[in-house]
Amino acid sequence: MNLISIPALQDNYIWLLSNKENRCVIVDPGEASPVLDALAQHALFPEAILLTHHHNDHVGGVHELLKHYPNLPVFGPKETAKCGATSLLEEGNTVSLLNSEFSVIEVPGHTSGHIAYYNAPFLFCGDTLFSAGCGRIFEGTPRQMYESIQKIAVLPDDTVICCAHEYTLSNLRFSNAIWPEDQSIEAYLHEISQIREKSQSSLPTTLGLERRINLFLRCHELDLKRKLSKEPENIENWQVFEMLRSKKDCF
């Protein structure tokens, strides 16, 4: 499988995953024109569109793409029916595409119906988990979002995290402010600062890396709890997550 990231809108990424037959899936097309350009550039034929949630910066290109590929199936959670999805998915479903299987994982929090697609080693997780961060909670609860991220956390270290926004540098600055003594975060902040100065992408990332530099995956650590609470032994992991997310919202 070959993975292509397409910069779109202000800071989005649209993902293409293709096989040896030059067939591909399009994940979260927030706009159509860069997708059409990439398909032409790489001589790819789309087999389906996969949607993670209903926000316009993830679905805004669907109708235009369907003008060019009118028989293209569009998969997504129930909340994307109004956005052009024709096959609605839920937890435990699998989708057969590219001579392969994509597993559907429900990850509510950012939106109430948000899903992710897993085709090892690739995870297309929309706005749930970002590099060094996580999505804002618009429709769900902090505990829901924490539990959704825990579903991702059990995947293997080599899982390729294909998230939908270039937020890595901002997330690392926040993490460094919370925990300035953490050498892994500080080193990666320096590395990503150099990458972004060259206007290069910081994505995709891997789950193994995120376990080290993403505080939202480290809510169980007592040292982090001490940073956030006067009673670190009495605070639950999801409450640590809630505190972090609240602080990030104001950062």
UniProtKB/Swiss-Prot annotation:
Zn(2+) 1 binds at residues 53, 55, 110, 127. One of its GO terms (molecular function) is metal ion binding. Binds 2 Zn(2+) ions per subunit. Its EC number is 3.1.2.6. Signal peptide: none annotated. It catalyses: an S-(2-hydroxyacyl)glutathione + H2O = a 2-hydroxy carboxylate + glutathione + H(+). SMART domains: Lactamase_B. Belongs to the metallo-beta-lactamase superfamily. Glyoxalase II family. This is Hydroxyacylglutathione hydrolase.
